[in-house]
Structures are given as C-alpha cells and as structure tokens.
Amino acid sequence: MIKDIDSLSQPIINIYSQIELDLIKEIARRFDLNDEIGGTMEWQLKKLDESGVLNADTVKVIASYSEKSEQEILNMLKKAQLANINMAELEEAYRQGSITVDPMNIKTNSAFAEVLELSYKELSNTYRLIQTKALESAKQAYMNVINRSYIEVATGTYDYQTAIKRAIKDMAKNGISGATYKRNGKLVQYSLEGAVRRDTLTAVNKLANKSSETLCDELGAEYVEISSHLGARTHPTNPIANHAGWQGKVFKIDGSDKKYPNLKESTGYPDDILGLGGVNCRHRMFPFFPGISTPNPIRFNEEENRRVYELTQKQRAMERRMRQLKKEQAAAKEIGDKETVKKLNKKISEQSTKIDDFCKKNNLRRDHSRELFKEQIK
C-alpha cells in the first residue's frame, strides 16, 4: 500500500513541464532583438513563412520525450494499481474466512490486468489530445507574437525591440495551452503542465479506486473505507461535492445497513464527477472488513479543514505566479534580453521568499515541484 499516491505522477508532470518550457523557448529563439528589418511588413511575411519550420520543430520537441514518457506512464500505473491494497489485512481476512479467494493470486488476476490495460489506453489517448492541443497552441502563440509586434511597430505605439519584448513576455506568461475546459459555463484554458497535472492525478486515483472496486468484486468484500486528508474540498449545499463530509468513513458497496450508508448515495462513486474519484479528487477507497480492519482514527475538524483548504488554494496561486515568472525568464534569455532577465531574477527571488514565508506562517509544506525546478530553466 502506498501512502502518498500523488507522488507517483510527478515524473510525468516533470516531463510535460519541460516540454512546455522547451516549446516556449523554441518560439522565443526565433526572434532577434537586433533584426535589421524587425517590425516591417517584410519581416512579418518572412516570419509567417518560417512557421512551417516551427511546426516541424515543435513536433520534434514532443517526440523527443515520447519514449521516456510512455515508460513512466506504465511504471506509474502499475504502482498506482496496488496503491490501495493492504496485503497483510487481506491475508488475515482470508485466514479468518472473511474472504474465500487467496489474495496472493490477485496480482495475476485477468480482471486486474484488464483494468490496468484500459487505464493505460485512456491516459495515453488523453496525452495525445493534450499534445495536439499544445502543438496548435504553440503555432498560435508564435503567430500572436508576429502579428502583435508588427501592429505595435507599424502604428508607432512601440519600437521593434520593445514590441518584441512585450509580446514574448506575454507569450511566456500565458504558457502553452494543453486543454480547454468549461467551468461555470465559461471556457477555461489550462497550460500544458496544468492540464497534464489535472488529468494525471485524476487518472492515477481513478485507477487505484477502480482496482479496489475490482478487488472487492473478486474477493466478495462488502465494505470500503475512504481515505482522509486535511484541506479536503468543501461545499455548502451539495453533500457529494462536500468531500470533507464523507472522507474517512466506511460505506457499504451494495445497499446499506444500520452502521454503514451506501457508497454511491453518499459519495457519488463512480459516476458523479463532483464526488469520489471525480476530477482532481485525491481520495482513495480501501477494502474494509468489519472486525478485522482497523478504522482510520484520524478525524479532521471541519473548520480547520476549510481553513487549510483556503490556504492551499492561495499557495497554488502563488506557485502559478512563480511558474509564470520562470517561463518569462527562460523566454527572455532566448532573445538575449539581459535587462529583463535581471529584473526577473529579482522577482523570482522575492516570490520564493513570499512562498517560503507563507508556508512557514501557516504550517504548510512547500512543494518545489509545482514551481518548476531550477534545472528545468537553465
């Protein structure tokens, strides 16, 4: 059984963070601050003509990571499938006659293998869609730099160097889009790294929970216990979307009894995207055997949970700002904008101190993996 299942997805997220950074640099390096015809119509036409070369090079960027990412995906999913399984507890349940199937045979079970194969196919397809969106986004980002710079120079709003610096900064700040989702009726663009993080964490937990479900079916287990963590999301009116309300409890898979309510009615699993196993849900479920399993004694105060959830959301916003600054810095280096690089070094240092102080003040763990590693921006 693995305690920190989220850590399994980090190698994949790191790969796609690097891909996004490489794409930003690939776009930026195509612009020369000292171009003699910079900002003219001749320059615009020349740059538009070069877009085909950019498209080929961005495909190469993604392809260069494909073999490594495929192996990491498989390693991640194999570990995730066993993350919710407590073999010692299952063996004790088998010894006491609570289950009739030897748990040692589970790993070679065909149903288990099918769950893993389906998860791998689904996630691979998700990544392909994200990659396609990223390639389209990179092309559009390049075109935006050209067209915006040309208009600003042609209208006399800015000189060529200033226009390029501004356009490159905004391109890097916005990042490369990996997906578009609807939120409250509005379209929301996710960066490549953000889309991969969201979909990978969801897939990993979905696989772990689906494997638990399959395990319960194979063993004839009737109950599951849900994990719990401080900072679980809350909702004032929807009990299924209020993860803090049902986390840490035991539920009956089919039907209910006096002690344990029904799993689906209480958590929405597996169909409700707002509930257990839904988008961005980190909760996991484990086979539970009354009289054998030891219930998790940890219970979180709802007010404290809400406070930590709100603080965590603030921390995520600060991390996003740090990623933006580092992307801007990488792009500025590519065009030789030393002045901007110097300014961004200062801003990055200040933002790092800000995050550090915030985490220490509120007793939160700083997650450097969400800020882009230093070696990623060299």
Set out the residue ranges of the language-model regions:
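Catalytic core of tubulin tyrosine ligase-like
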Residues: 283
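Domain-core detector
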Residues: 1-274, 289-378
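Short, solvent-exposed loop/turn segments at the edges of secondary structure
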Residues: 276-278
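An acidic, gly/pro-interrupted, aromatic-rich
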Residues: 286
